[in-house]
Amino acid sequence: GLPVCGETCTLGKCYTAGCSCSWPVCYRN
């Protein structure tokens, strides 16, 4: 139920601050 960060992480890494990767989408911590 975490809000989506507006970023994908198909390479396994999120570049947006405060976001973590739950492949293939980044979620806010």
Curated annotation (Swiss-Prot):
There is a cross-link at residues 1-29 (Cyclopeptide (Gly-Asn)). Keywords: Disulfide bond, Knottin, Plant defense. GO terms for biological process: defense response. This is a cyclic peptide. The keyword Transit peptide does not apply. It holds the Pfam family Cyclotide. Disulfide bonds join 5-19, 9-21, 14-26. Belongs to the cyclotide family. Moebius subfamily. Probably participates in a plant defense mechanism. The presence of a 'disulfide through disulfide knot' structurally defines this protein as a knottin. This is Vodo peptide N.
